């Protein structure tokens, strides 16, 4: 299949939503409840507040290609450095093959920067993330070389407690001899359950430059123990042979405010 270029991916969400950058007083504040990039694949369309540090962590068990694996801690560290702007880093996660033909090893460390460009904060939110997986992990797990990516998570609050969310990501693998580009699209239907809990169902599609796509249905939920702490879970089921047969995970996230 044909993939849109970087310029098209950058411009399309902005044109559709009529985006102009959010002003500082419309950005997330320390009194805002925690908004995480987990447990769904789709990341939050909001950044962490300026002066706040957020840590998101989780473990998964999965089955694919006839083998079982465990991975953790899937840690993402996020720091609000300016209004509507954060820096983040995905720390190396260890993937342990339990049985079957799967490989074991660490994933890459992946720094990034995220900018919130909400055209209508609280109703329509959009962010742009630019990052790269640095070649620190096991090649059998993550593939060869540096892997830059661009990403656009968005959300739209509907009537009542419902919202729809989604994300488009382009992963570039310049020195991969076969697949130099993978595009991932997600779509989420989410519902708030009271003031502190939420549930979701999510579609995830990975489309490679060469080879067949992978389709996954993911569902789960989370609970805010406090306004700055969250526990969560998810269960994903693959829809074709290119996706994991299943993946189940749990997680815990927290945020510290007013650091500067």
Feature locations, PLM:
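C-terminal region of N-terminal signal peptides and the immediate post-cleavage residues
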Residues: 19-23
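N-terminal secretory signal peptides that target proteins for export/translocation
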Residues: 1-5
């Amino acid at each position: 299949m044909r993939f849109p270029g970087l310029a098209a991916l950058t411009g399309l969400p902005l044109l559709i939503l009529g985006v102009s950058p959010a002003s500082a007083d419309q950005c997330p504040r320390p009194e805002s409840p925690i908004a995480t990039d987990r447990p769904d694949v789709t990341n939050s369309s909001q950044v962490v507040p300026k002066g706040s540090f957020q840590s998101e962590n989780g473990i998964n068990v999965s089955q694919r290609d006839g083998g079982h694996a465990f991975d953790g801690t899937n840690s993402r560290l996020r720091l609000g450095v300016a209004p509507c702007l954060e820096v983040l880093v995905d720390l190396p996660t260890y993937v342990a093959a339990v049985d079957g033909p799967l490989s074991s090893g660490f994933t890459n460390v992946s720094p990034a920067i995220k900018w919130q460009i909400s055209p209508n904060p609280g109703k329509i939110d959009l962010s742009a993330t630019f990052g790269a997986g640095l070649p620190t992990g096991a090649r059998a797990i993550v593939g060869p070389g540096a892997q830059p990516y661009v990403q656009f998570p968005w959300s739209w609050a509907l009537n009542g407690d419902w919202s729809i969310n989604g994300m488009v990501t382009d992963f570039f693998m310049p020195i991969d001899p076969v697949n130099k580009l993978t595009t991932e699209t997600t779509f989420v239907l989410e519902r708030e359950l009271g003031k502190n809990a939420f549930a979701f169902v999510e579609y995830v599609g990975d489309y490679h430059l060469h080879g067949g796509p992978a389709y996954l249905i993911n569902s789960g939920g989370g609970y805010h123990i406090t306004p700055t702490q969250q526990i969560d879970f998810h269960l994903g089921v693959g829809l074709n042979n290119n996706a994991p047969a299943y993946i189940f995970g749990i997680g815990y996230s927290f945020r510290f405010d007013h650091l500067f």
